[in-house]
Amino acid sequence: MTLLALGINHKTAPVALRERVAFSPETLDQALGSLLAHPLVQGGVVLSTCNRTELYLSVEQQADLQEALVRWLCDYHQLEPDEVRQSLYWHLGDEAVSHLMRVASGLDSLVLGEPQILGQVKKAFAESRRGHGLSVDLERWFQKSFSVAKRVRTETEIGSHAVSVAFAACTLARQIFESLADVTVLLVGAGETIELVARHLREHKVKRLLIANRTPERAQRLAEDVGADVINLAEIDSQLGEADIIITSTASTLPIIGKGMVERALKQRRYQPMLLVDIAVPRDIEPEVAKLADAYLYTVDDLQAIIEKNLAQRKHAAVLAETIVAQESMDFMGWLRSQSAVEAIRDYRTQADSLREEFEARALAALRLGADPEQVVKDMAYKLTNRLIHTPTKSLQQAAREGDAERLQILRDGLGLDTH
């Protein structure tokens, strides 16, 4: 049995190919069933995200294994092997083990250290478990990878520094305001970036969230998801003074918030400070706002500088994370190799127990017939010794006859002959 990882990702294939190789949630059960029906596959997990599609398998090692699995993948997606072969990567044994650990830890992600991938790996694992697709070794491999990912998060700062604009904006807000529990935030826009900001803020239990957008329907959908209130763009002027933090990201070609609007808001707030984060290009907030004493304006360029610094810190943390993965991968492979001896140890124990029962029964029978107890013990010890050394003696003699010094030494080590 061999552990294997096969797949494509953002580093090896363009999005056009990744789309064609992806497994949709609706077809995942069917795909898993088809994969598990393959004669070489003992267990499998299918991981399919926007950035990667990977098969994690326990398989019977054969000469044509790679070609057989590539053929299955291509047949399932109605692709020609030559269309995907150059983009596929293939990891066996310890390379497969460390690859999954790196993926789960965010070390192989498009955004270094991003935490979402761990949840996606756990979901893929759960899907396989529901479909009875897990072999013992495969389950142990994934559980170990989850614990490694947790250790990486705990012992390094791989996820501590914002490397997306949305996360950086929220991190900045948390740094300036000690707690968001007493803060009102106004979000202007309802696109993907603002949606990510809104979800980050909800996780940090912001006191009140307002969303203003040119299209009220889109703002309303987002507001329902994150527990926010919706206002019209025209209401920003009157509502601005309520907000401690304003984060904007629209497609407007002209500024939405001007210096005069912020001056009025500050007066309404009795000049309590305001944080304004403009992550739009072109800018949503007039640059002159930065000249106001109690208004702290940050642009996307300011956030980019934060992101670059944080990415450097993540890369530094990744060095330690890679060390953890290497160590844990080696430990897991040691455990995996030890499993190959489990059956032999079990058989050896059964044989020893059978031998003990045989000689014990003979001794008890002799005692019941009135034999001398001392002689019974001596006979049992002599015969048991001869039986125990018979097979090892033959193996030692054969190794010596064949001049196999390595095997002879292995036998000596196994029998404990060189311990004194």
Swiss-Prot record:
Pathway(s) it belongs to: Porphyrin-containing compound metabolism; protoporphyrin-IX biosynthesis; 5-aminolevulinate from L-glutamyl-tRNA(Glu): step 1/2
Positions of the catalytic residues: C50 (nucleophile)
Gene3D superfamilies: Glutamyl-tRNA reductase, N-terminal domain, NAD(P)-binding Rossmann-like Domain
InterPro entries, A to Z: 4pyrrol_synth_GluRdtase, 4pyrrol_synth_GluRdtase_dimer, 4pyrrol_synth_GluRdtase_N, GluRdtase_CS, GluRdtase_dimer_dom_sf, GluRdtase_N_sf, NAD(P)-bd_dom_sf, Shikm_DH/Glu-tRNA_Rdtase
GO-annotated biological processes: protoporphyrinogen IX biosynthetic process from glutamate
Keywords from the UniProt entry: NADP, Oxidoreductase, Porphyrin biosynthesis
Residues that, per the record, bind substrate: T49, C50, N51, R52, S109, E114, P115, Q116, Q120
UniProt binding sites for NADP(+): G189, A190, G191, E192, T193, I194
Record GO terms (molecular function): glutamyl-tRNA reductase activity; NADP binding
Catalytic activity: (S)-4-amino-5-oxopentanoate + tRNA(Glu) + NADP(+) = L-glutamyl-tRNA(Glu) + NADPH + H(+)
SUPFAM superfamilies: Glutamyl tRNA-reductase catalytic, N-terminal domain, Glutamyl tRNA-reductase dimerization domain, NAD(P)-binding Rossmann-fold domains
Source domain of life: Bacteria
Sites annotated Important for activity: H99
EC number: 1.2.1.70
Disulphide-bridged cysteine pairs: none
Parts forming coiled coils: none
PANTHER family for the chain: GLUTAMYL-TRNA REDUCTASE (PTHR43013:SF1)
Misc. remarks from the entry: During catalysis, the active site Cys acts as a nucleophile attacking the alpha-carbonyl group of tRNA-bound glutamate with the formation of a thioester intermediate between enzyme and glutamate, and the concomitant release of tRNA(Glu). The thioester intermediate is finally reduced by direct hydride transfer from NADPH, to form the product GSA.
General function of this protein: Catalyzes the NADPH-dependent reduction of glutamyl-tRNA(Glu) to glutamate 1-semialdehyde (GSA).
Domain comment in the entry: Possesses an unusual extended V-shaped dimeric structure with each monomer consisting of three distinct domains arranged along a curved 'spinal' alpha-helix. The N-terminal catalytic domain specifically recognizes the glutamate moiety of the substrate. The second domain is the NADPH-binding domain, and the third C-terminal domain is responsible for dimerization.
Assembly notes: Homodimer.
Family, similarity comment: Belongs to the glutamyl-tRNA reductase family.
Protein's recorded name: Glutamyl-tRNA reductase
Gene name as annotated: hemA
